[in-house]
């Protein structure tokens, strides 16, 4: 997928925050202001977004994992949907401290959730009292909400993609600590520090968020498709197929 300037304008990617809330470190990406609202320079954003997508494409081609992070109301649904479409893990509820830096502990909760799912599938609820079944369902629901999106992650991701880096400071800090590259949408009220692939843009509009998230999901699918195509072409080679006759 190639994103155009027109699409970014239509999605409102250029609208920043009120000028009084600005972060001076975002000055290089600000075009000006209108009605006390900063306007982001999309001529800077577009190539930076394309660089981020190129990186994601290469990562996916090498079977890398990108963890999608977006827990704000306007990003939750689309983020979970697009991460699912790309077959990638995601966090759409609260970020639990230590989700990356203490992944060993998180893995215990993931195992518990998977065991509960298997037990439910096997009809365990039928052998429980009403109260036990209710408590079981509640615990499972709670685990599904907090870690359901990462239950198949397996290990530390190769990169994280964050919508609104200020809102997800803990996630960014944990990734920085572990040397995990961060792709992040940075609005005018936050700092681009600690973000390896900065996407200067509006992080509040659901239309803008949908554009970034779909773009990253598409890049992952393209990267995977390209890798498969290369394998198929390499397998074909110039060798002629010879059927071996049974003796």
From Swiss-Prot:
One of its GO terms (molecular function) is structural constituent of ribosome. SUPFAM superfamilies: Ribosomal protein S2. One of its GO terms (cellular component) is cytosolic small ribosomal subunit. InterPro entries: Ribosomal_uS2, Ribosomal_uS2_bac/mit/plastid, Ribosomal_uS2_flav_dom_sf. Gene3D superfamilies: Glucose-6-phosphate isomerase like protein, domain 1, Helix hairpin bin. Keywords: Ribonucleoprotein, Ribosomal protein. It comes from the Bacteria. GO terms for biological process: translation. Belongs to the universal ribosomal protein uS2 family. This is Small ribosomal subunit protein uS2. It comes from Cupriavidus metallidurans (strain ATCC 43123 / DSM 2839 / NBRC 102507 / CH34) (Ralstonia metallidurans). The gene is rpsB.
